[in-house]
C-alpha cells in the first residue's frame, strides 16, 4: 500500500491552503492507513492553540487537527527548527500530538513516503 505524506507549509488563516489540506487529509484516510502529516515553515502555526480566526471572519478549522487520531492518523511530525525560528516554545501544548524533529530527521521521515502532497 502506498504511503502518503501531507506537508503543511503555510500559515493557517492567510489562505485556504491549510483547510483544503486538512479536508484532503481526512478524505485520504478512507483510502489508505499509511498517512504521515508534516509541518514545516509557517505550517507549524497550524497547530497553535487558542487561535481566534472568527475575528478576521475565517472558519476555525484548527481544532479538527485534534481528531486525526480518530481517523487512525498518528504519524505527525513538526520541524523543531521552524518552531524555534518563529519564536515559539517547543513545549507548546499543540492541538495535535506531534513528534518534534530536527530538520535532517524530519526530511528523513518524509523520504519514507511514496507520495507527497503539499499545502
From Swiss-Prot:
KW Cytoplasm (keyword) present = yes
Protein keywords: Cytoplasm, tRNA processing
Query: So which domain of life are we looking at?
Result: Bacteria
Nucleotidyltransferase as a keyword of this entry, yes or no, is no
GO BP term, example? tRNA processing
What single Pfam family name could you report for this chain, choosing any that match? Answer: DsrE
Q: Which GO terms describe its cellular component?
A: cytoplasm
Q: Where is the signal peptide?
A: none
Q: Where in the cell is it found?
A: Cytoplasm
Entry's family note: Belongs to the DsrF/TusC family.
Physiological role? Part of a sulfur-relay system required for 2-thiolation of 5-methylaminomethyl-2-thiouridine (mnm(5)s(2)U) at tRNA wobble positions.
Subunit and interaction comment: Heterohexamer, formed by a dimer of trimers. The hexameric TusBCD complex contains 2 copies each of TusB, TusC and TusD. The TusBCD complex interacts with TusE.
Q: What is the name of the protein in this document?
A: Protein TusC
Question: Per the UniProt entry, what species is this protein from, by scientific name?
Answer: Pectobacterium atrosepticum (strain SCRI 1043 / ATCC BAA-672) (Erwinia carotovora subsp. atroseptica)
